[in-house]
UniProtKB/Swiss-Prot annotation:
The chain crosses the membrane at residues 9-29, 42-62. It is a multi-pass membrane protein. The active site is at H230, K232, D237, H408, K410, D415. It comes from Staphylococcus epidermidis (strain ATCC 35984 / DSM 28319 / BCRC 17069 / CCUG 31568 / BM 3577 / RP62A). Signal peptide: none annotated. Belongs to the phospholipase D family. Cardiolipin synthase subfamily. This is Cardiolipin synthase 1. CDD domains: PLDc_CLS_1, PLDc_CLS_2. Pfam families: PLDc_2 (PF13091), PLDc_N (PF13396). GO terms for molecular function: cardiolipin synthase activity. The keyword Transmembrane applies. Keywords: Cell membrane, Lipid biosynthesis, Lipid metabolism, Membrane, Phospholipid biosynthesis, Phospholipid metabolism, Repeat, Transferase, Transmembrane, Transmembrane helix. Residues 225-252, 403-430 form the PLD phosphodiesterase domain.
Length: 490
């Protein structure tokens, strides 16, 4: 065996690996610095240093950013009307010329004004909201609304499993296709990894349209696996909408290994449907290879039915956005709280500024309550969540671990006045990497319903104390330390 030759090959590979690492480090530090937080940059440099070649491969799958141009393709001049609406609302707030009937709109005008800096986050009024915390009740209503649809049905989901629940919904959609309705389904290619377009052959033969978000172009390999569409929305006839945390699948009915699935979702009616419809059209056009999905008037009809009193903004965020509106909205709400804060999130891995905001609120006398799962669905994420939550104990934050199955709810509510419900977790992935959508709701009734639901959850939770946390074994401390170190890339 020619060991000299093998040594030469090994040397060449090491040199190539070193040069590749240096180039990639240069890209991360300088060329993508505007799209990354400092913690993310350091985390990736750590991975490259510890795992020179493997780190490069991981970066190809997990580290690349998303082009804003790609996400805004096919929309042309269609957005001008919404941009004008947002600018008019900004002007009215700047001139203190409100004209709104909802007291919470005036009281929290600073939050509203901030969210308006993204063109799809226009303020809507006269909205009716129904709250769901149980998957069975939610999807009974969803199926009823689908069967009652008259014109079109649009669905966008991170996970759309074709199991018992998924097949029931697909059957309902195919029934409406036979009646001549328009049906569009956008699912995430990684979140719905068991599903392929070929599974929708009959659905498409009936005239249904289906698209996968950032699909893999190479079998078993997806170079966009770290930037996923985590949104969960439905629009029916431009009159009814759904937004929240529930995906489609039997797991979300409590039939999976994690047991009972506790989540939060809303059914909405009113002006807010136009905002959900806009979000769907933008996302569909970013992925579809078909002719542009037009902003036809039929998708933004005059609203009928009972009017509610809630004001709502639909805020979106994602790696192609200049502003992280949901993260900003969460932080602004926390800093605005005067009496109480209620938080639920399955994954709690925010940056230090978010942690500090909660500490400052608690140290200022605000009652801060955080609820997280007692069991992991992703081990590293779980330990990072636990470690971050425990950091708040010294400030007097109440930390609850939910015991009755798995809590997947993503809500923030302050002062029994305003709340946020949607797909975004309180973590780096939701704030920086995934495409998310949340409803910021200015309505005391919904806020109080969320508090009541939280208090009911407390009955099935354990309070985490400093005394108990400090007694955790060394193995747990090691897991937490490692998970926290790599949390910016989890």
């Amino acid at each position: 065996m020619n060991f000299g030759f093998l040594g030469t090959i090994l040397t060449i590979l090491l040199v190539v690996g070193f040069i590749t690492n240096v180039v990639l480090a240069f890209v991360i530090i300088f060329l993508e610095r505007d799209r990354r937080t400092a913690s993310s940059t350091w985390a990736w440099l750590f991975v490259l240093f510890v795992l020179p070649v493997i780190g490069f491969i991981l970066y190809l799958f997990l580290g690349r950013t998303v082009s804003k141009k790609k996400m805004e393709k096919n929309n042309g001049d269609e957005l001008h009307a919404f941009e004008d609406l947002v600018q008019d609302q900004i002007d009215s707030f700047d001139k203190h010329n409100y004209g709104y009937i909802n007291d919470q709109v005036i009281k929290h005008r600073d939050l509203i004004r901030m969210l308006l800096m993204k063109q799809d986050a226009f303020l809507t009024e006269n909205n009716k909201i129904d709250l769901f915390t149980d998957g069975h009740k939610l999807y009974e209503k969803v199926l009823e609304d689908i069967y009652n649809a008259q014109d079109y049905i649009h669905l966008e989901y991170y996970t759309f499993e074709l199991d018992g629940l998924g097949k029931r919904i697909l059957d309902a959609l195919e029934t409406k296709l036979k009646e001549g309705l328009e049906v569009k389904l956008l699912y995430d290619d990684v979140g719905s990894k068991k599903v392929r377009l070929s599974k929708f052959k009959h659905f498409r033969a009936l005239g249904g349209e289906v698209e996968a978000f950032f699909p893999s172009k190479v079998p078993l390999i997806n170079f966009r696996m770290n930037n996923r569409n985590h949104r969960k929305i439905i629009i029916i006839d431009g009159q009814i909408g759904y937004i929240g945390g529930f995906n489609v699948g039997d797991d979300y009915l409590g039939l999976g290994k994690l047991g009972y699935w506790r989540d939060t979702h809303t059914r909405v009616q009113g002006e807010v449907i136009d905002a959900l419809q806009l979000r769907f059209i933008l996302d569909w056009n970013s992925q579809s290879h078909r002719p542009q999905f037009k902003f036809d008037q039929k998708y933004f009809p005059k609203k009928i039915g009972d009017k509610g009193n809630a004001a709502i903004q639909i805020a979106s965020s994602g790696p192609a956005f200049d502003l992280h509106q949901i993260e900003y909205g969460y932080t602004k709400m926390i800093m605005s709280a005067k009496k109480s804060i209620y938080l639920q999130s399955p994954y709690f891995i925010p940056d230090q500024s978010y942690i500090n905001a909660l500490k400052m609120a608690a140290n200022s006398g605000v009652e801060v309550n955080l609820m997280i799962p007692c069991k992991p669905d992703h081990p590293f994420v779980y330990w990072a969540t636990f470690s971050n939550a425990a950091d708040l104990l010294d400030s007097g934050v109440n930390i609850y671990t939910y015991q009755n199955g798995f809590i997947h709810s993503k809500i923030l509510m302050i002062d029994d006045e305003i709340s946020s419900i949607g797909s975004a977790n309180m973590d780096f992935r939701s704030f920086e990497l995934n495409f998310e959508v949340n409803a910021f709701i200015y309505d005391e009734d919904i806020a109080k319903q969320l508090r009541q639901a939280f208090e009911k959850d407390i009955e099935q939770s354990k309070l985490l104390t400093k005394k108990v946390y400090d007694k955790r074994p060394l193995s747990i401390k090691f897991k937490e330390g490692l998970a926290k170190l790599i949390s910016p890339i989890l």
